[in-house]
Structure formats: C-alpha cells, structure tokens
Design a protein with these regions (language model features):
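Extended catalytic cores of very large enzyme megasubunits
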Residues: 2-758
Length: 758
C-alpha cells in the first residue's frame, strides 16, 4: 500500500500514515472508495470533498428507522396532529405560492430514506428530537437527573412554537440538527455558523500555516470565517528547495485539498523545506455529478489555481516578512478556491488596523487591479481597453471574497475611512475594546470578554481565536403578545445552550467553547416591530427579555453542570430563514416597501426551477454563470412598512444602537445603507456620533441598477400586477414526492450581502 502524507513537521520529507487528530474530521476514519495501488505516488488523505456523499455511504442504512441514533423521540400521536396543518409561510409570490415554502423546500427539507422530501412538520420533529437527544445523552453520560415525561412536555411546547414560527434555529440548525452528521457523530461543527482565527501566533510555534489551512477547512464546511492581520511582519519567508520529488497525489476530499494548501504554504514559512509538487489526477473531472446535491464538480482547476496563485505570491521572497496584504491575499485566495470548487459559498472578514494604508487599499482597483480582477496597465492602474472599459483578467480576482474592516477603539478618529467607505463600502469598523469590556451597553463594564480578538463575517459575534458562533433566533412579531414572546425565549435560548454541549472535531475550538459557552439568541423582524409598536415598547421587550434569558441560563447551566454562558444575545442579519417565517431580517428595514421583484438562484436542471417555470415565473440563465445557473424572478409581497430608502441613515444606526444597549451583550450586525447623493457626506458624523454606542458598523450605498438580476428590484404597480396575475400554483406535491434535489442547507448567519455566491 502507498504511504500517506499527513504532516511534514521535521525536515520536509517525513512521511506518516495517519492524519493528525487535530486536523481529522469527524468522518476521517471512513475508508476511501478508491483503491490506490501505485507505490510511486504519495497520497494526501482526507474526508471526501463532497461530505454528504461520503457520510451517506458510511452511515449504517440496514435499519428501517433512519433516526436510530437519536436518544429522544417524540410520540407519533403528538406529531401527527401537525401533519395536515399548513405552516404560516412568509412572503407570498402569487397563486398561493410563497418564498417561505420555496426556501424551505430548496434549503432545509432533507431527503428521506424513501426518496421523498421532508414536510415542514417532519423537519420540526427532526430538529426537536435532535435537540432533546443531545440534552438526554449529556444528562445520562454525566449521571445527571433526566425526567422523560418532563422532557416530552418541554419538547412538545418547543415543537409547537417552532412550527408556528415564533423561534427557530439558524438555517444550519434547520438543515443539520437531528441528522447522523450531528447526533450520530456527536459533532456540532455542522451546526456552527461562523468563526474567527487570529494570525497573531503564527511565529510562536512549528505550525505557522495553521490559520490559513483551518480557514480553508472551515470554509469548505460552510463556516464563515473572520481573520486578522496581527501576524504581519512577524513571520519571515523562505524559498523552498527544489529536490525533484515525486508528485504528491491530492485526494478528492476536503482534507486532501486542505492538506495540500497547508503543505504548500508551510514550505514558504519554515526553513529548509522541500518544494511540493502535486498530482491532481484523482480529483473528479469538471462536470461530474455531485451525489445528493445534484450539482456538478468544478474539477481540479480551482485547487490548481490556488496553488499557482500562492506560489506566485510567495516565490523568491526569501528574507522578507509576511505582510498584512499577504495575509489577506492568502485568505482571499482560499475563499475564491472554495467558491470556484462549487463546494460552498464563501464568507470572510479580514480585520486590519486603521493606519495600514496597504490594508485600506486592498480593494482599491486603481492601486490593486489584479486583486479585483483587472489587468494591470503600464501606469500601475487597471489597463483600459479599446472600449474605454477596464480589461478583466482571465482568471478573475480574489479580493472580493472578504469584507474588510478595521480594529478600532472608542475615541479614535476614523474620519479618514469615509473615502473608502463611499468608494466601495469598506472598511467596516469593529470596536474591539468595547467588545472586550462590555456586554449590553446598558450594563456596567465587566471586562469578562477580555480574550476577544475578532468577530465573525457579519459582525454580530465577538470571538476569541478559534471560537465559533452558536446562534438561534426569535421572531417577536410572530408572537401573540409579550408573555407569549417571553415564554418563547426559553426554548430559543435552550436550543443554543444545547448546541454548546456537543464538541466540534477541533480541539483548539473546544478548549474555548467549553469555557465560554457563548451563544447568540437573536431577535429578527425588529424594523417591523418598531413600525407597529414603537421604539419604547421594543426597549421593554428587549430589556425584560434579556433578563429572562439570563434567568434561564442560570437554571439550565446548574442542571447541566456547565458554566453559565459568557454572553447570550445578539442581533444577526438573518437570511433565508427570515423568508421562511415571514419577517424582515434582523434590525434592517426591508429593501422595498410592500411589493417588488425578488430573484432566486438555482442550478440548471433543478426540477424546482422547472416547476417554477411551468407555474409561470420568469426563468432565465444566470448572467454570472449562464452554463450552469438559472435566475427565477418572483413578484413578492412583503410587509407594508417603510423600505430602506425611506429611512434615514441616522435612524438605521439608531435602531442598532438601541439593540446594543438593551438586548445584545455580544454585538449587532448592521449594514447601514445610505443615499450616495444626500448622505455620503454624513458618514464621518455618524461614526463619531455612534462611537461607543455600537460595537460594529458597516455601510453600503443604496443604488438602483447596481447589477443585473439583483435580488430585490423595484417595479411599477402595473408591471408587478401583470407578473402576479400570470402565475399559477406550483406543483409542490411532485417536488415533495421526490423530484426536488436534496436541500442545500445554509452557510453562515448571513443575508444575501454577506456571502459570495457560487
């Protein structure tokens, strides 16, 4: 049998037969389906790149009960009460169809053993049974009291409140909770939305590539990643030694791809390392089907391109130090590889310092045309073609894969950032000292979170190095009244706390998360709430609701024998989950008032797209990916409240500030849109006014016609009505019966603005 290269720690040539446990995925023990017999080749090991395929093949399937691994099961007679009840789907799109059901079917409904798709009540059952199974196993494992009857009473109430749209896990929880990936493997990685990795320690040990390859692994698992540039100018670069070794075969696997990136980056960060050359022959070709998800593989080209770009960036720089630009470039190149590989979308945030001009100019195409996908001209700026437009590079850029923000401190002067913000919306601002010192701003300084080093890509969760986000959300506008809302908080909180009981497969992450037990219970639909009930009523719900969550955290932490959570509340941006439950996202006002066109994206050949076309919706090729992508345009009706163009920049940030004061002890995700003609000049004043009142702040110009097939499009009443009258009911039954592809799940905690679409 061939040797398996998993580490190159000693001299660049050592060979080991087993992957390092800190890098091994929860499924890493599964045997590869490919029998490799060529003794001249060295393999990189790993979990299959398309993890659903590998896990499905490895999971025991001889049992009739596909949920045999769950320790807690609801009674059938209780669940069947909901079988014929229609969920309150959000956002009508004509003829009784809704964006809510569309998003549920395409993202969160899993295929069952018989080939059909989960109905909504079945998904709710899976989530609740998975949640209470974790609690039960924890209690029994630690010999703690467990009352089955009491658990059933609680689980039934949690079920009903989820079914009626009063709370929900984030999209990743709807997709993964109660599955073999989570409950069968006792691994919470698939439930985590985002994380943070610091480069501050890259020069301290023998694993300087760690933040870069861990970023790649997290991204390939759908975890959005924040990272910083603290390691800039601490790590000397070296030139690998050309020794003409045999090529190393890269396995068609997540770990194989990640390990190849580690080996290549490390060869430039440690002395006396051999240059590495790879053989990509085992990676499935472009266009090959991806089992389960129904998409197609991108082939080895994205990985080849990543390796080539990394070599071009780091070659022949011996004696130089790794710069902040290098750190961001490596992170962005990894993000582009993940996007291009059709594995996941990518969400990254890079945190730099406010006086680093190189960092601030990373997305300035006049200074860095290659990063933004343009050919550099003789004057150093973008090359201008005969059509007077900038010439695009064949391979495209990579700088777009992260949102870039600066680490700030309260009282600093950040007026100089406004120019970049107006130009491209960046940088955002993250007040690191406020995150370390304060929880809710209504409460006194406590310095409990002094270890915080960064934030997740959407800005709602301050995090330590290697820490992940555990999120959950509640929908106040779907609750009957304050007491109904207050009761619902118990079950939303309990979901988040339950997820903290499961480890990930990363020891470095478990060390932090078991100490902090950080969760983020988010309120969603707040603009709607304010428009209907007013700001003071929201303040009451937030303040008393926060106290209620803290009360429950004391009770459940004591029973479970774990620490109380360091922080418990947040405001996440929300995304497709808010569409399912029919509320506005996070603390943002809707893009449009009342009615508008909403576009959604599907792959060519997806039966859902065919069903939508047959129902009268406009379906056309995706202009960004016409060979494989489709765009469906839906006439959508949302809440009849002010759209974001009708709300001032100041009011938007003020709502975030109230949430930071009275609800969120973590942070608040706020992307404040502004009118570029009338409000751009006010940005410095807004930053100064809310300095010390929010922990994170980013801006985005509100412009019409920014790009073709935009997610939200304003149309005239006549055009809207014509499209509305044209559609007929979608044949959902045939899709639920099994025609629809496996759900895609949801990455991160994002709105459409946070992730780079595949």
């Amino acid at each position: 049998m061939v040797a398996t290269v998993a580490s190159n720690r000693s001299n660049g040539n050592s060979t080991r037969h087993q992957a390092h446990p800190s890098r091994a995925g929860g499924l890493s023990s599964f045997k590869s389906e490919i029998d490799r017999q060529d003794p001249t080749k060295t393999f990189l090991p790993g979990l299959h790149l398309y993890a659903a395929e590998r896990a499905a093949a490895a999971e025991p399937r001889e049992r009739d009960d596909e949920f045999y691994f769950l320790a807690f099961r609801l009674h059938d007679d209780f669940v069947t009460q909901y079988r014929d009840r229609q969920p309150k789907w959000g956002f009508p799109i004509g003829a009784g169809n809704t964006l809510g059901e569309y998003n549920f079917l395409t993202k969160y409904s899993r295929k069952k053993l018989n080939g059909s798709k989960e109905r909504f009540y079945e998904m709710v059952r899976r989530v609740i049974e998975g949640m209470f199974s974790i609690q039960k196993e924890h209690a029994l494992r630690h010999k703690l009291p467990w009352n089955e009857n009491k658990a059933h009473t609680s689980a039934q109430e949690a079920f009903d409140r989820l079914f009626t749209g009063k709370w929900s896990p984030p999209g990743r929880g709807l997709w993964m909770m109660g599955t073999f990936f989570v409950n069968g493997l006792h691994d919470s990685s698939a439930l985590q939305n985002c994380g943070f990795l610091s480069t501050a320690f890259i020069a301290d040990g023998d694993d300087p590539a760690f933040p870069f390859y861990r970023l790649m692994e997290m991204s390939m698992l759908g975890v959005g990643v924040g990272f910083d540039t603290r390691g800039a100018n601490t790590m000397q670069l070296y030139q690998p030694i050309e020794n003409n070794h045999e090529p190393i075969i890269v396995d068609d696997s997540r770990e194989g791809w990640v390990e190849s990136a580690r080996m290549l980056i490390e060869s430039y960060l440690l002395p006396d390392r051999d240059a590495v050359v790879f053989d990509y022959s085992e990676i499935r070709l472009a266009g090959a089907p991806i089992g389960g998800f129904g998409g197609t593989a991108a082939g080895p080209e994205p990985l080849i391109q990543l390796h080539d770009r990394l070599r071009k960036l780091l070659n022949y720089r011996q004696g130089e130090f790794l710069t902040s630009s290098d750190i961001v470039d490596i992170g962005n190149m990894v993000g582009k590889c993940v996007v291009a590989a059709n594995v996941r979308s990518s969400a990254e945030i890079a945190l730099g310092v406010a006086d680093d001009e190189a960092f601030l100019n990373l997305k300035n195409a006049m200074v860095n045309p290659e990063r933004m996908g343009y050919v550099r001209g003789p004057d150093g700026g973008p090359l201008v073609g005969e059509d007077e437009k900038w010439v695009e590079s064949e391979q495209g850029g990579w700088g777009y894969t992260s949102n870039n923000s600066v680490l700030a401190e309260v009282g600093g002067n950040y007026d100089h950032l406004a120019k970049g913000i107006v130009m491209n919306g960046e940088p955002g601002i993250f007040w690191i000292d406020l995150c370390q010192q304060r929880g809710r701003l209504a409460d006194p300084r406590n310095d409990r979170d002094y270890r915080v080093m960064g934030v997740n890509p959407c800005g709602e969760q301050p995090l330590e190095n290697n820490e992940l986000c555990t999120l959950v959300e509640i929908y106040p506008t779907n609750c009957r009244d304050f007491m109904d809302y207050k009761r619902t908080l118990k079950f939303a909180y309990l979901y988040g706390k339950t997820v903290t009981l499961l480890p990930t497969h990363w020891p470095e992450t478990n060390e932090v998360m078991t100490r902090n037990r950080r969760i983020g219970t988010s309120m969603t639909g707040l603009a709607e709430f304010v428009e209907e009930h007013g700001w003071f009523e929201l303040r009451k719900w937030q303040d008393e609701g926060y106290q209620e969550i803290r009360r429950w955290d004391g009770i459940y932490s004591e029973w479970l024998g774990v620490r109380e959570s360091i922080k418990v509340t947040t405001i996440k941006p929300s995304g497709t989950v808010s569409l399912v439950f029919g509320v506005t996202p996070g603390c943002h006002w809707p893009k449009e008032r009342g009615q508008y066109f909403r576009t959604v994206r599907e792959n060519v050949g997806n039966p859902v797209a065919d069903a939508m076309r047959e129902a009268g919706y406009h379906v056309e090729p995706n202009v960004q990916n016409p060979e494989f992508g489709l765009v469906i345009t839906c006439p959508a009706k949302g809440p009849d409240i002010r759209g974001e163009r009708e709300v001032s920049l100041w009011e938007k940030v003020a709502l975030a500030a109230q949430c930071q004061e009275w609800w969120s002890d973590n942070s608040v995700s706020i992307t404040a849109t502004y009118d570029p003609d009338t409000e751009a000049s006010q940005i410095p004043a807004v930053i100064r006014a809310f300095d010390g009142k929010v922990k994170a702040l980013s801006f985005l110009a509100a412009q019409e016609g920014i790009y073709a097939q935009a997610p939200y499009q304003r149309v005239s009443p006549e055009v809207f009505q014509e499209a509305w009258d044209k559609v007929k009911p979608v044949d959902w039954e045939r899709l639920y019966a099994g025609e629809a592809w496996e759900g895609a799940g949801e990455a991160y905690c994002t709105t459409d603005a946070c992730e780079v679409p595949v």
